């Protein structure tokens, strides 16, 4: 054993070991994430952001955040038909402690997509770029599968190439018709029950019977210039649950009645 002093222990350990550890969460604030009034449950959840310090404004750090929420959570529903749809909401503005979101896309869960792909059938897909009446450019993906006819004795149900082309053309026509004649809010209302996919399945029965027809994905490629009035209209009173956003609070604050001679309490520290 070497004889001598241990320099590290004699000086009290490493340099900087007595530095005070500050919890980073003390510098952050919680904000409520609000969904548009197309959904039943307006209170999506909460999100963290650093407090405003100098030129770093908290609201700037929140704008542009994308939240992915299951449709079952947005509709307060435990139905399995809703749980595999995921809606993306993007934060567009901040009012007080509320983060106002707008529709940013839709997708199906991976396990649902994998469970639909099977042998002895034909998978048919299509994608269409369509523009809504209020200027949103969307890319809509549709998926469907062939199914055996009730009188067929075959093991397989493969469609011919000409039938696949005809079904894909029918998908494109119905999606273009339903989206181009609607604004973004109406498109989302059609995506909630998936009425577009049901129309496709019904209209393609004469070409080849289909099942498991879904709008697989919706992407927002381009959006018009940000309009605060339109966003506040989306977050107005729509019968949804949760705290609604008041337009008066957004524009000039809320008027609170105070008794005469009221004085605010003196704070000990700022």
Swiss-Prot record:
Subcellular locations according to the entry: Cytoplasm
UniProt superkingdom: Eukaryota
Residues making up the signal peptide according to the UniProt record: none
Any matching Pfam family: Ribosomal_S3Ae
GO molecular function: structural constituent of ribosome
GO cellular component terms, A-Z: cytosolic small ribosomal subunit
Family that this chain belongs to: Belongs to the eukaryotic ribosomal protein eS1 family.
Protein name: Small ribosomal subunit protein eS1
